[in-house]
Amino acid sequence: MKHAIKNIHFIGLGGSGMSGIAEVLHNLGYVISGSDLSDSATLQRLARLGIKTFVGHAASNLAKVDAVVTSTAVQADNPEVLAAREKRIPVVPRALMLAELMRLKQGIAIAGTHGKTTTTSLVASVLAEAGLDPTFVIGGRLNSAGANARLGLGDYIVVEADESDASFLNLLPVMAVVTNIDADHMETYGHDFANLKKAFVDFLHRMPFYGTAILCTDDPAVREIVPQVSCPITSYGFGEDAQVRAVNVRPVGAQMHFTAQRRNGVTLPDLEVVLNLAGEHNVLNALSAIAVAVELNVPDTAVQKALAEFKGVGRRFQSYGDVPAKGGGHFTVIEDYGHHPVEVAATLAAARGAFPGRRLVLAFQPHRYTRTRDCFEDFVKVIGQADAVLLAEVYAAGETPIVAADGRSLARALRVAGKLEPVFVSEIDAMPQAILDNALGGDVVMCMGAGSIGLVPGKLLELEGAQ
């Protein structure tokens, strides 16, 4: 980065990807400031670190700035963007700033439609346990670090590679993981799945000739792109042909136990793994971290310890403990960021394994009208796998409502399918009381979605405490 650039301002600082980059740059010695539309715990934490934060966007926030970083949510007519353009201050997309950070280290980029945050966290934890002291920028809060970013002194930087706006094509990693490829954010790719797959191939081709692609070949779309990938590949999955493979997989409470077989060129001894996460989808995420560890010669003991002691990621199968039920007994509250049908299905399956025999109550807030429209039938099928459903209105994320792609339409479709009788909750603020009114002793309540439903578990505990 040019030494003339010292003061960097972030528009949309409260976002998980933005705040992580800002924190790393702050720790590198840059003078960081940033703004967001509303105050948040993230802004408050960054302020405590010494970063100047603003609530609201205004041209006056750019008093002394050499460069401006924007998130994809920031519009071109944002007053701070307009002020920067007028002053000829460079306006840099978030992904380009992340790419600049990666130039300082050897980059390990985690891509895929689902599982990026957990996988990035697992890889960072394994490298940290091995003493490699990685830098990481994650889309969620790594519980063991208490943050979503950290500047390490080691050679590696582990980052999420975001395909939602194709910005991962700005990154230049030396190692890349692809967890899966699924139809999401299709407006970016002209609603053509072939374009999405090509973008992943192009992403992998941004690695140098000595780079390694670590691919989950259980995923059909990932298997389809393998012949087009020219760099060395390590495959992982449950399939017999996977070079890093999980066998003897079994849930034990909220953990997964399995044996990892590793046979990429040289066959290594089987590795007995205790993973402190629930669900077979997280076994796949752990396999990718094991594959990275093999490439970097991480000792087996470090891999085993990191996975067994993994403390999880905020909003990923996060437990809020037990809450008294109206009719007696207690119900367990779990919160998860999953908002695509594939993610919801995997998380419900994980809950079945972690809490066998217990009734699953899904409190779900759909995220984006376009996703609800494009995945409508899949949502009906997956949501119907719960034993009871509390359905919120769609979290718009800035989108305009779409007819027949809202929460009421989903509730109606579930009734027509005859799977269950959902409770529609029109205002998310009413969800905590709706949960208290409907949950029974022994239930597991899953609060799921990428929007404001993330606030529901905390408000539920407050409401229960006040009664």
UniProtKB/Swiss-Prot annotation:
UniProt cross-references to InterPro entries, sorted A to Z: Mur-like_cat_sf, Mur_ligase_C, Mur_ligase_C_dom_sf, Mur_ligase_cen, Mur_ligase_N, MurCDEF_pg_biosynth, UDP-N-AcMur_Ala_ligase_MurC
Biological process, per Gene Ontology: cell division; cell wall organization; peptidoglycan biosynthetic process; regulation of cell shape
Localisation: Cytoplasm
Domain of life (superkingdom): Bacteria
Pfam families named in the record: Mur_ligase (PF01225), Mur_ligase_C (PF02875), Mur_ligase_M (PF08245)
Coiled-coil boundaries: none
Top class in the EC scheme: ligase
Catalytic reaction(s) noted: UDP-N-acetyl-alpha-D-muramate + L-alanine + ATP = UDP-N-acetyl-alpha-D-muramoyl-L-alanine + ADP + phosphate + H(+)
SUPFAM superfamilies (alphabetical): MurCD N-terminal domain, MurD-like peptide ligases, catalytic domain, MurD-like peptide ligases, peptide-binding domain
One GO MF term: UDP-N-acetylmuramate-L-alanine ligase activity
The protein's Enzyme Commission number: 6.3.2.8
Positions of ATP binding: G112, T113, H114, G115, K116, T117, T118
Record carries keyword Methyltransferase: no
Swiss-Prot/TrEMBL keywords: ATP-binding, Cell cycle, Cell division, Cell shape, Cell wall biogenesis/degradation, Cytoplasm, Ligase, Nucleotide-binding, Peptidoglycan synthesis
Family assignment from sequence similarity: Belongs to the MurCDEF family.
PANTHER family on file: UDP-N-ACETYLMURAMATE--L-ALANINE LIGASE (PTHR43445:SF3), UDP-N-ACETYLMURAMATE--L-ALANINE LIGASE-RELATED (PTHR43445)
Function description: Cell wall formation.
Protein name: UDP-N-acetylmuramate--L-alanine ligase
Species, as recorded: Polaromonas sp. (strain JS666 / ATCC BAA-500)
